[in-house]
Amino acid sequence: DTLSLHDALPIYYCTLIALHKPPFFEEKHRIVWREIEQVKEISEIKHPVVRAVMDHMNIQRGLEIFYQGDLPARTGLGSSSSFTVGFLNAMYALRGQMSTKEQLAAEAVYIEREVLKESVGVQDQIAASFGGLNRINIHPDGNFDVHPLTISPIRSNELKSHLMLFYTGVARNASEVAEDKIKKIPGKKAELTEMQKMVDSAT
């Protein structure tokens, strides 16, 4: 199993608004992000996650989608997976359906890895779906267990007061970074074993 300790800190946000679009317009869908897209078909959408999720969920009605994020892309803080999870959740909400955290995480992984063919891990999608401080066990078959860690507000504030976060301005592609990490795993077994022990001692 792969173990990791994750804390989804409520510092930065991505805001998604999804509405059904009246059927009176020539363009069926309008997506506002870095670009403003107005298209007739899902296949014409440039935003890869929006296109993949709408196709995956077989969206029939026209949509207006507005996205605003506190972070630029490719910061390494999980903003892409947060968007995927949030957009899936919004699509279910438009259907009047509730989705479980497990389902959101699994579908986000499927969209990013199987549909978009990105070489990414699964921790970010799980962290975005569950939120909070968790011990995540990822099994060889791809299934996972999430164990929330309950700590007092005093201990939580103490932990956060000892963390520092810096923006370097360096953009990186998560898929490329993951590919490089996978190649180096055979030579890093001792370090990875030690890191796994740290998760055990922390939880």
What are these regions (language model features)?
Residues 2, 47, 81-85, 129:
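Short alpha-helical patches at coil-to-helix transitions and adjacent helical residues
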Residues 62-64:
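Residues at or immediately flanking beta-strands
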Residues 71-75:
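Short pre-catalytic strand/loop immediately N-terminal to key active-site residues, enriched for Gly-Thr
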Residues 1-9:
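Short, small-residue-biased leader/transition segments that mark boundaries at the very start
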Residues 6, 13-59, 68, 91-94, ...:
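C-terminal nucleotide
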Residues 66-67, 80:
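Helix-to-disorder regulatory junctions
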